[in-house]
Amino acid sequence: MALRLEDKKAIVAEVNEAAKGALSAVVADSRGVTVGAMTTLRKTARANGVYVRVVRNTLARRAVEGTAFECLNEVFTGPTLIAFSNEHPGAAARLLKDFAKEQAKFEVKGAAFEGNFIPAADIDRLAKLPTYEEALAQLMMTMKEASAGKFVRTLAALRDQKQEAA
């Protein structure tokens, strides 16, 4: 179906606006995925703060022009689904990686984070980034373990001191 020039400009503007506010982007090939599965993906994406759109390659190239996601131009081949993470950098990568496990024909092509291209083979690095809450919990656990260890060492030093005095 041919798109009018106004429609193309609207799509480019919409995707460009999503790209400007996004933390990361993931590009995938959704050929062979059923409509029902894509609908489920879109619902899950909305719930996780991820913008998902199937875009023509030329429109996608124009939309990411001048953004941190220009490095994705090389993977804009074939049918292109682009997902932008708005709340957490790993949200889109995690979402599409999990979806690819369920759908054999769904293929992640690559991702971009802070202007750097991440090949599909390394998408786990982005998907495994902890959320803000998880990172805080890890920091608190580290601090808690460090203070507990310091307390134990202080008690051991006090014990050794008393044994030497006796």
From Swiss-Prot:
GO CC annotation: large ribosomal subunit
Example of a GO MF term: structural constituent of ribosome
Coiled coil, from the record: none
A UniProt-annotated Pfam family: Ribosomal_L10
BP GO annotations: translation
InterPro entries according to UniProt: Ribosomal_uL10, Ribosomal_uL10-like_sf, Ribosomal_uL10_bac, Ribosomal_uL10_bac_type, Ribosomal_uL10_CS_bac
Keywords: Ribonucleoprotein, Ribosomal protein, RNA-binding, rRNA-binding
Disulfide bond residue pairs: none
HAMAP family found in the cross-reference section: Ribosomal_uL10
NCBIfam families xref list: PRK00099.1-1
UniProt family annotation: Belongs to the universal ribosomal protein uL10 family.
Physiological role: Forms part of the ribosomal stalk, playing a central role in the interaction of the ribosome with GTP-bound translation factors.
The protein's assembly and partners: Part of the ribosomal stalk of the 50S ribosomal subunit. The N-terminus interacts with L11 and the large rRNA to form the base of the stalk. The C-terminus forms an elongated spine to which L12 dimers bind in a sequential fashion forming a multimeric L10(L12)X complex.
Protein name in the entry: Large ribosomal subunit protein uL10
Native species: Shewanella amazonensis (strain ATCC BAA-1098 / SB2B)
Lineage, top ranks: Bacteria, Pseudomonadati, Pseudomonadota, Gammaproteobacteria, Alteromonadales
Gene: rplJ
